[in-house]
From Swiss-Prot:
This is Ornithine carbamoyltransferase. It is found in: Cytoplasm. It comes from Methanocaldococcus jannaschii (strain ATCC 43067 / DSM 2661 / JAL-1 / JCM 10045 / NBRC 100440) (Methanococcus jannaschii). The lineage of its organism: Archaea, Methanobacteriati, Methanobacteriota, Methanomada group, Methanococci. PANTHER family: ORNITHINE CARBAMOYLTRANSFERASE, MITOCHONDRIAL, ORNITHINE TRANSCARBAMYLASE, MITOCHONDRIAL. InterPro entries: Asp/Orn_carbamoyltranf_P-bd, Asp/Orn_carbamoylTrfase, Asp/Orn_carbamoylTrfase_sf, Asp_carbamoyltransf_Asp/Orn-bd, Orn/put_carbamltrans, OTCase_ArgI.
């Protein structure tokens, strides 16, 4: 199977991957080598720190061989067609992990690849990040049902995957964005379908940051302008400040709220220093959990291959 976004998973699948992630975290030096004898191509059109390190180390600690290629070594759809790249790589490696600019490139790669393709980030989705986020919420809150999670800022790829992941585990999700910066409309429809299918959770889009943050158990934000984004910086800096997670906004959330950011953070913009470094912040646990939950993704995929 391919993991291009979370809508290919069921609730049971998501909970199983989280369970695997928690297991790998508790048994980091003692767990089984499920990738022994296997090679994993890790492709980066977009530079990365956490994604590259976490996937590289995950493959290594699972006994596999990570083959990392950066933007200067791969030319998806340029010097060679994506079809040819995918077909050839499928004969060399056991899995392809790709961080790309265009989600459609991933879809084409998955169409022609004979091995699983895992989305390590695209302009539409960031599923592995959200699996790590859900694992972090599970660690801190012990549950999903009945929790309110509020995302504030730009309705970007992280936001898209977050509303799918939150829908799958039954949380009540509020997305607070400026007008015109809402998450992808098709993803919103998918999330609402998931909520209707399970009969749990909810999804509310609002342009009011206080409505989003009020009584929240989890506050989440991301950068206002993503890498490769063509947003007008002056416009963003004019209309996004009310959606900043700061001490004032924190007062509207629950006393035991946790604050999340997928990093890297532009401190002083989408989140203030005192909040990201404060007692409610779980950003470093969240970042660490990328490593563990991605091991869980490999285990899940190879069990079903």
């Amino acid at each position: 199977m391919h993991l291009l976004d979370l809508d290919v998973l069921s609730r049971e699948d998501v909970l199983k991957i989280i369970e695997y992630g928690i297991y790998f975290k508790k048994n980091r030096r003692k767990h089984e080598k499920i990738l022994e004898g296997k090679s994993v191509a890790i492709l980066f059109e977009k530079p990365s720190t956490r994604t590259r390190m976490s996937f590289d180390i995950a493959v290594y600690e699972l006994g596999g061989h990570p083959l990392i290629m950066n933007q200067n070594e791969i030319h998806l759809g340029k010097k060679e067609s994506i079809k040819d790249t995918a077909k050839v790589m499928g004969r060399y490696v056991d899995t392809i992990v790709a961080r790309v600019y265009k989600h459609r490139h991933l879809e084409e790669m998955a169409k022609y690849s004979s091995v699983p393709v895992i989305n390590a980030l695209s302009d539409l989705a960031h599923p592995c990040q959200i699996l790590a986020d859900l694992m972090t919420i599970k660690e801190y809150k012990g549950k999903f049902k009945g929790l309110k999670i509020a995302y504030l800022g730009d309705g970007n790829n992280v936001c898209n995957s977050l509303i799918l992941g939150s829908a799958l585990v039954g949380m009540d999700t509020y997305v607070g964005t400026p007008k015109g910066y809402e998450p992808n409309a098709k993803v919103v429809l998918k999330a609402k379908e998931i909520i209707n299918n399970y009969g749990e959770g909810s999804l509310t889009l609002t342009n009011d940051p206080i409505e989003a943050a009020e009584d929240a158990d989890v506050l989440y934000t991301d950068v206002w302008i993503s890498m490769g984004d063509d947003k007008d910086k002056e416009e963003v800096l004019k209309i996004f400040p009310p959606f900043q997670i700061n001490s004032k906004l924190l007062e509207y959330a629950k006393d035991d709220v946790i604050v999340m950011h997928c990093l890297p953070a532009n401190r002083g913009y989408e989140i203030t220093d005192d909040v990201i470094d404060g007692e409610h912040s779980v950003v470093y646990d969240e970042a660490e959990n990328r490593l563990h939950v991605q091991k869980g993704v490999f285990k899940f995929i190879f069990e079903r291959k």
